[in-house]
């Protein structure tokens, strides 16, 4: 059973289905039943579980036999997490539990897939569903023999993390009243269900609460976990630098949206003892714990954390001490390792120190500032567990980007990394690093079918997502929720080049930034460089003489296709952009295509498009196992599976460092670069997705 064909892909997939329902019940649309022995029955069904399982098996279309193992993992730590608790990787106790479970899954010998399935079924029966889902996903992604098993869309298995809690009561009613084969009308999710525009931060709710944006963050942290016993799971190429770059781009994109709404750029949270004016009421319920996510009132403070149940005992003094040590490392350009020796500080080390991942050079000295900051923010309402309250949305990778404070915290993280980039130990780029002799960009433009030149068009779209895979304890059949989100008309870049040298390759780098700052003044480059959002990056052959490059927006190296954010789990592989599932599991991490372009304004927001054709001799990477890239999607944010990051330059190049000579973007432009004024215009209407199920129109 070592090949991953047919059943061996289908059966592991079923462990994602209806995560809060026990495995005794049928799974999947075909009502498949796992044949459980007493050892594999959940503890609460110990008396009659096998009998119930057999009874369900009588109606099943498929019965899945399970191999009986000589021994099962003890899960001494992981079994302590109650099945109805919420799970957060940011809590030390939960990290230890996750490490224990991932070890058990990774330690099953390769190609012993019956053993692997039985081990996972045992874990699924005995462990918290959210803990299981995370560990199972990481294991599937990192085992060579399971990488063809698709990681299920988290918004469909745990829909309560992505949408208004009132939806689920209505959804259960629909499944109970309407038979499975009757078309069901979608449940409409209103656009403004968490607040009103009296709260100015709410103007950005469409962006912060977007399903695709939150799925991106969840999937990125699945691909780049910060802790594991097997170092190789964490120690991926340039991982710390990617932590900086991906989050830097989130802040830049968020700031673009803020400017479109006449708001200032996000203010970093740097005084950790001052009140936090931003309140947040998530209006989400956890279907696992059957409780609402705790809100945060305005003007609450961080407080020292002492929650033994979570393994948290940290003071603000600890955080400030770690911060001083990080600042000293930045100001001296040196980092002190755990053994007392010192090494040069680079951005990759700084990212791992700040987060902190297990790759941090010295956890004792530099702590875990980023992760603990999330915990401080998540427990302001109950820092000592006096009220038995769980954490706020900011401590869960799938919900954290909903909270306005996420951006204030990450603005501080980004500012700390930028101080390193601006320090004397990181030299600005020289002209020879920026130029590409013989390559001259003569013009650049963007075109939209039937639209005005150099104008990008955004609009609202409403789409349906099927909730039935996450609706535990209800009848089968599709139940759709319809929600509205920002989208953009497809466009293409047209770049004209004169190459006076011989034929060669080049890397095309495309960025965009608002033309004016909050005061409607022209930016200084020192500020605008942090506002440039990466739109695309690709390698292109150039002929001698005149060349014209056209590139579609849907081919962006930053994004994943729309279908991957809102895909149904069953019809796999119909997307021509996806070569195989293994790459999807990795490349499923990526910025959502529908959020590629900032919202703009109805009057038209002024942006600048920047295009650079860099010298490929300085860009190219020698990949292990050759340069055959299996997955081109979203490599800018997510790297490539089992390979080096596909660009030798610093992430964010050429804007990751200040310029020593240019004071504004016009001064920065060399012959191999071009700048083009463009307009982003919002059409404030809602269009139906033509792919919505016919029953739902």
Curated annotation (Swiss-Prot):
Glycans are attached at residues 260, 313, 498, 552. Keywords: Copper, Disulfide bond, Glycoprotein, Melanin biosynthesis, Metal-binding, Monooxygenase, Oxidoreductase, Secreted, Zymogen. The active site is at 355 (proton acceptor). Cu cation A binds at residues 217, 221, 247. It comes from Spodoptera litura. Binds 2 copper ions per subunit. This is Phenoloxidase 1. Expressed in hemocytes. Heterodimer. GO terms for cellular component: extracellular region. PANTHER family: LARVAL STORAGE PROTEIN/PHENOLOXIDASE (PTHR11511), PHENOLOXIDASE 2-RELATED (PTHR11511:SF4). It is an enzyme of class 1 (oxidoreductase). Its cofactor is Cu(2+). Cu cation B binds at residues 370, 374, 410. It catalyses: L-tyrosine + O2 = L-dopaquinone + H2O; 2 L-dopa + O2 = 2 L-dopaquinone + 2 H2O. This is a copper-containing oxidase that functions in the formation of pigments such as melanins and other polyphenolic compounds. Catalyzes the rate-limiting conversions of tyrosine to DOPA, DOPA to DOPA-quinone and possibly 5,6 dihydroxyindole to indole-5'6 quinone. Catalyzes the oxidation of 4-methylcatechol. Binds to the surface of hemocytes and is involved in hemocyte melanization. It is found in: Secreted. One of its GO terms (biological process) is melanin biosynthetic process. Its main location: secreted. Belongs to the tyrosinase family. The keyword Nucleotidyltransferase does not apply. Residues 1-101 form a propeptide. Activated by a cationic detergent cetyl pyridinium chloride (CPC). Inhibited by phenyl thio-urea (PTU). Disulfide bonds join 587-631, 589-638. Pfam families: Hemocyanin_C, Hemocyanin_M, Hemocyanin_N. Activated by the cleavage of the N-terminal propeptide by PPAE1. One of its GO terms (molecular function) is tyrosinase activity.
